[in-house]
């Protein structure tokens, strides 16, 4: 260990990169976000269980699910602008505080043995809105706490964290709900508090991201810039639209499986275990996502993922046993996590730093916004035609998406569009040193960010 310019650095070989654990700010960002995600997962799943078990109404459960996913449609674009204008660390801290207070109101109402669907839906909306701001800020900050060559590894580590939390959070939430309805919400409050304490220690950015020319722009103009940036990249926008369709399908599958378990007399904990199986599959998928991203082009990953989903999803129509559903969720989540790692790395790598929030918000609007429509539509579809026919519908939609992905990404010109869109933004010029020589900005960043 040595000290240069006030920064503690580890001695390493000429070509070796330090591990991600060597970066203090990345460790704190990862840990604080892990607790925040765990809190959101515990309360998010408990919202649906609470309404479904208390009212017995699939449409009410779908309404709460819609409220929790609606911010993906309404909040994404304004949030992207604000993330590019404000200090991202402070945005994250504010989001944690607001979510903590909102979820605490549910815990208090349950301690008083009171449940209102409108209250649960409102808190679900507030929590999800703050989660949008938080996720955009966190993803943008990753680029500032690790060097460019380790961005893919950092994204894979973050996705593995989220999938691992899904694996743990869903069964824990289901088990706590089985013991007492207020327990998942009170646990979320405690986790949010721990997340806040961790984020306070994060150095973060001293100022908001620089804006070219320092020109003041209105929000509508800033949103238009982000939309135009995505729309001008043919391959990028096509991939996003197809993934948006698959997200709509998966949201419908999740709600349908919950109803299947309840119809068959299963407990809330059974749903948690099925979701945990998906979390385990996602964890393994995230771990191999970086490896896959280095060996396959994005268009090849898209075809592989959608064809596999189309082949395995119809199994839910014929096999209702919890073990079979758990295996299905393991496979679909494994592939989904690998696609997510590749997609996030792709987007962050090609997007300029001062546009990370806006471009990320457009991506999340297209990819996750469709999920809100999936939750709402599936709730009413279930009441109209039942679980079996609903599963047939969502499976059929996935088959269509697989055919579209195969046709679009194997056509002449698809490879050229992929290469054009994936060209990274200009890299910074070498840093001038007093003796007249220059330094590689990557090396400079590594030395500045490492704290043993």
Residue locations for each model-derived region?
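Intracellular juxtamembrane helix-capping segments at the cytosolic ends
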Residues: 47, 133-146, 338-351
